[in-house]
Curated annotation (Swiss-Prot):
Self-association and partners: Homodecamer.
GO biological process, one term: D-ribose catabolic process
Family: Belongs to the RbsD / FucU family. RbsD subfamily.
UniProt-recorded name of the protein: D-ribose pyranase
Protein residues bound to substrate: 28, 106, 128-130
Chief localization: cytoplasm
Upper taxonomic lineage: Bacteria, Pseudomonadati, Pseudomonadota, Gammaproteobacteria, Enterobacterales
Function: Catalyzes the interconversion of beta-pyran and beta-furan forms of D-ribose.
Length: 139
């Protein structure tokens, strides 16, 4: 049995194949996922697993150098926005690097998902609970 933190074989596989600046999306249950992009569907029911549960597990195994969020999260989901920013702050301290955070419109965000290595769908049912994680290097 795998000893690492990620037991899901699809998530483990996609993270292991990420190169520098490749992207991986963690999204809520409602984000449209392009047919051309790999979908890893973790959603079991509303809220299970939560967006932050998925982000937490993914970022334990993935080196993150940047994160992209939809601007709308600031107004439409401020509590989750703050939780995510706190998580990313703690992650950069743990990794020993600065994680660049940027924002774009939700419409542009949806277009950017098409270039991702995969989209991991959570069971989150709150607005704009989506992040594009950009892979860094560990050296």
């Amino acid at each position: 049995m795998k000893k690492g933190t990620v037991l899901n074989s699809e998530i483990s596989s996609v993270i292991s194949r990420l190169g520098h600046t490749d992207t991986l999306v963690v999204c809520d249950a409602g984000l449209p996922i392009p047919n051309s992009t790999a979908r890893i569907d973790m959603a079991l029911t509303q809220g299970v697993p939560s967006f932050m549960q998925v982000v937490d597990v993914v970022t334990r195994e993935m080196q993150v150098e940047a994160a992209i969020l939809a601007t709308e999260i600031k107004q439409q989901n401020p509590q989750l926005h703050e939780t995510l920013l706190t998580h990313l702050e703690q992650l950069q301290q743990h990794q020993g690097n600065t994680i660049k955070i940027s924002y774009t419109t939700h419409e542009q965000f949806k277009k950017l998902t098409a270039d991702s290595q995969a989209v991991i769908r959570s069971g989150e049912c709150s607005p704009y609970a989506n992040v594009i994680l950009c892979a860094g290097v560990t050296f």
